[in-house]
Amino acid sequence: MRLLDDLQAGLAAIDAAHLRRVRRTAYSPTDRSQRISVPGEAPRDILGFCGNDYLGLAAHPALVEAMTQGTQQYGFGSGASHLVSGHSIAHARLEARMAALQGEHIPEADALFFCTGYMANLAVVSAMAQAGGIRPAEECTIFSDALNHASLIDGARLSRAPIKVYPHVDLAALEALLAASTSRNKLIVTDGVFSMDGDIAPLPELLALAERYDAWLIVDDAHGLGVLGENGAGVLSHFGLHSQRIIYVGTFGKAAGGSGAAIVGHRLVIDWLVQRARTYIFTTATPPGIACAVEAALDLIASEEGDERRARLDRHIAVWSAHAQRLAARFGWQWMPSPTAIQPIVIGENAPALALAAALEHEGIRIAAIRPPTVPAGTARLRITLSAAHTDADIERLAQALEAAGQSLQPAKAA
């Protein structure tokens, strides 16, 4: 069969380029260390530096209890989409909580809860490109950072609006594109914290451009909510921004430890999304127990315990940054300084990045080797992510293991 032959050839090409992805199976709750297996091997305990559980909340007893109680109260499933009969009071409470949280930064804010961050980003970009029923191909232009998350890129593509990609955080290039645009509506789309580099978008400058050129600013704060800003309120709080032009996407699958996402914007923006966001309209609502757990996670994030966890994470970032800078200089890698939990070290080609990741996993440490197309060709990297759940000893163990792996694989440079 020709299709299967084509698939086999495509998979062979993926293997030849060292780009095959392999799933691992976890046998224990998400934590700093998990019991994990890879295909063909028995499960074993692995110390993880590759997840997004930045505050160590994924298995927090209070959140497990909140989900259990919510499920007991409202049942397992929602039974329908939000616009039919699946919109629970648990969903409504969470939306009100997010609207209040970001309402300090977005006047007349309302919020809309989605099953995943990916679905939220598909919705906000594609639906806002058709705001008010305009023809997106003729009356809206999307301005997208070159390193935006795949979900923002896909949302732009689905919108059928023209897309102008500007070099990563290049404000001059973006301004030139905005100045040349004659579109009725303009959408500037950006990650708040970039998922592969760990840098924070220059949101004050982006908002200034949005105001100057009558554009809207869509911010995906997947990696900022919970860890940045006052009481972990996110990247808008981090910068102290305030504008009706901001549309905010907060994701609950990272620092909040759960799943789902909420879009926060002016009440008319949210009402439009209810009417036109296909990934909201045409899917079963998230189980209400998850909404209950996420609301409890937001409580915990804003609490004294949340402050303590953020402080611990910040200490880990400072200690690890010193190790990473030293190791990168020793082995000829590129250290990418980041003030966030995302701490990438660029190795370059795919094969050595995979070899380093394999050597670390052999020693019981899991770090993802990120390769194209997730990152540009020639920038394969170890994407190290830190968590408040890690201990000081974990950070030292990682530094020692990475140094040993680098020395064994690159003895000439290590001399």
Curated annotation (Swiss-Prot):
Cited NCBIfam families: bioF (TIGR00858)
UniProt EC number: 2.3.1.47
Family membership: Belongs to the class-II pyridoxal-phosphate-dependent aminotransferase family. BioF subfamily.
Residues given in the record as substrate binding sites: 21, 149, 374
Catalyses which reaction(s): 6-carboxyhexanoyl-[ACP] + L-alanine + H(+) = (8S)-8-amino-7-oxononanoate + holo-[ACP] + CO2
Oligomeric and partner information: Homodimer.
GO BP field: biotin biosynthetic process
Official protein name in the record: 8-amino-7-oxononanoate synthase
Any single Pfam family the record assigns to this protein: Aminotran_1_2
Transferase keyword on record: yes
This protein's pathway: Cofactor biosynthesis; biotin biosynthesis
Major enzyme class: transferase
Family annotation (PANTHER family): 8-AMINO-7-OXONONANOATE SYNTHASE, CLASS II AMINOTRANSFERASE/8-AMINO-7-OXONONANOATE SYNTHASE
